[in-house]
Amino acid sequence: YGYATQLDRDEVIDIDCDIWIPAARPDVINEDNVDRLKTKLVIEGANIPITAAAEAKLEQRGILCVPDFIANAGGVICAAMEYHGASEGMVLQTIGEKLRRNTRQVLEDASIRGISPREAAVELALTRVRKAMSYRRYALFSTAPGFV
């Protein structure tokens, strides 16, 4: 790319942008650099790319964060579908549909209830896990204190 400017990896966070997608390593955004981030939306493409304290600070600044286990669930969906013999086209279509639906649901829930997208995502995940477990023998234990 002859027209591009090469940056040091630590300078990438200083770029003013609309959407910032940390997609490689955990804890890329942390308490030491979160104030340098100049964006409107963070889509967590990596696993745990933002520390909890940094995510709370972004929320205080009005910067929306789509949690990692919502934004990067495509790999899990792909693996499950490939295991069952789905075609590449079907896998890509399903990933797109599920990620859009889950993201929309989490953001709407967060907005309506006045909670963070992460809190809404955790509640959605717990609801789905409980429902899935109710179909199995684990349902016998679902009333135990502290059980998912």
For each feature predicted by the language model, list its residue ranges.
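A structured beta-alpha segment of the ubiquitous adenosine-cofactor-binding alpha/beta core
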Residues: Y1-D32
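Adenosine-phosphate binding glycine-rich loop
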Residues: A23, D35-V148
